Amino acid sequence: MKNLISLGVFLLILLSVQVNAQEQSVLKIRPTGRILMDGGLFHSDNKNFVDGVAIPDARIGVKATYGKYKAKVDIGYAYGKVSLKDIFVERQFSSHALLRVGNFVHQFGLQSSTSSSMKVTMEEPASNEAFFNSRLMGAMFVYDKNDFFGTASVHVESEALKKKSNELGKMGYGVMSHLVYRPLHDTGRLFQLGISGAYETPRYNSEPTLNHTSFDLGANFPTRIAKVRAVNALIPDAKNLIKFTPEMIAGYGPVALEAQYYYLQVNRKKDFKNYKASGMYGILRGLLIGGNYRYSHTDCGIATPDSGSLECVFGYNYTDMSDTRSHIYGGRLNDVSFTVNYYINKYMIWRFRYSYTKITDRVGFENQSLSAFQTRFQVIF
C-alpha cells in the first residue's frame, strides 16, 4: 500500500510539470449529460419482475481542456440516489500517450471502452458485469499508436470513493493492463486481438468477519427496470484474485463480430480450495442502413455508426460461477438476445431488445428463466 501511495505522489508530480509552458493556452469548458428512458415487459416465474418504465440513468457534468490537460466531472441520478461517476484529470504527453488520474473505468477488455449507455446489446453481457470492475480510483497510462494499443493501471477498491480509510479498516488495491494488436483498422476492414489481465487484494465487506478477506462477485438479470440478482458468489478466506480476458474483433463491410472470454481465480487461505469461474460472450452486428463499420482509436473498438444508421445485433452470453471443487455455487447463466439500434442523430438513439435468460445451479435459488422485451430512448451530449 505504501508503494502505491508513493507511486501516486510521483504521478501527481509528473502531471504538474511544464505548467509554465501552458500559460498561453485557452481554457475550454463544455457541459455534458445523458438521459435514458426505458420500458419493459417481462415473463418469469420470479415475481420480482414487474412490467414498467424507468429512467435508470440521468447525468450532468462538465469537460474542460487546457493545453495538454483535460478534466471531467460527471454526476449521476437514478432511483432517488445521486452518485459520483467520472472524476479525473489527464495529461497528454504526445499524440500517442497520456496519463489519467482520478475515479474512472480502467481498461479491461472490449466492454471497458464504451460507457454503459453505449452498449450495442442495450445491456452489457452478464460475464462482463460479473468479472469486470466498475469505476476505481487510481492512475492509468495509455499508449495508442498505429497497430498497437496498451494501458497499465494501479487502483484502490471501489469503496474508497464512498468511505473514509478508517471506516474501511483497510484499503484493497490492484493492478491491471489491456494490450491490443489491430493489424486492420480501416473502414470496412477490421481485425483486432487483445488480452487483459488483473490482480486484486480482497475487498471491503460490511460483515466484520468478511472484511478484506473475501470477494463478492455477481451480475443482475439484463434489465435496469427491475434489479434482480442472477448469479452471485461470495468467496471467503481469500488471499487475492487474478483474472484475464482475451478478446477479438473482426469486421468486413457492414458486418462485424465481437467476442471475449473471461477466466477468474480467487486464491484462498489455509486448506480451502481456490475458487475458479469463467464466462464468454459473442456479438454479431450488422448495419441494414448506414454503410460500413468504422474503427475508433479512442475507444479501441468499433465506432458508433453514423446518424440515420439502422443496426441489428445478435448476442449470446454464458457465465459459470459454480465451482464444484471449492463448493461455491454462484450459478450458471445462459443468455441470448436480439437488439435493434436506430441512430436517430448525433445525440439520440432508440433501441429495442428481446432477451431470454436462464439461471441454473445457484445455491438457495431455484432454476428459473426470464423473457424480456425492452425498449430505450436515450439522449447523450
Task: Label each PLM-derived region with a short phrase.
Residues 14-15, 69, 365:
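Hydrophobic alpha-helical membrane context
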Residues 1-24:
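Bacterial Sec-dependent N-terminal signal peptides
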Residues 23-160, 166-203, 286-288, 298-304, ...:
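Outer membrane beta-barrel
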Residues 83, 111-112, 162, 268-271, ...:
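A short, polar/proline- and glycine-enriched secondary-structure boundary/capping micro-motif
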Residues 13, 58, 62, 378-379:
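Short, Lys/Arg-rich amphipathic segments at extreme N-termini
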Residues 3-4, 54, 131-132, 331-332, ...:
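Short hydrophobic/aromatic segments of transmembrane alpha-helices and their interfaces
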Residues 46-47, 209-381:
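Outer-membrane beta-barrel pore domains
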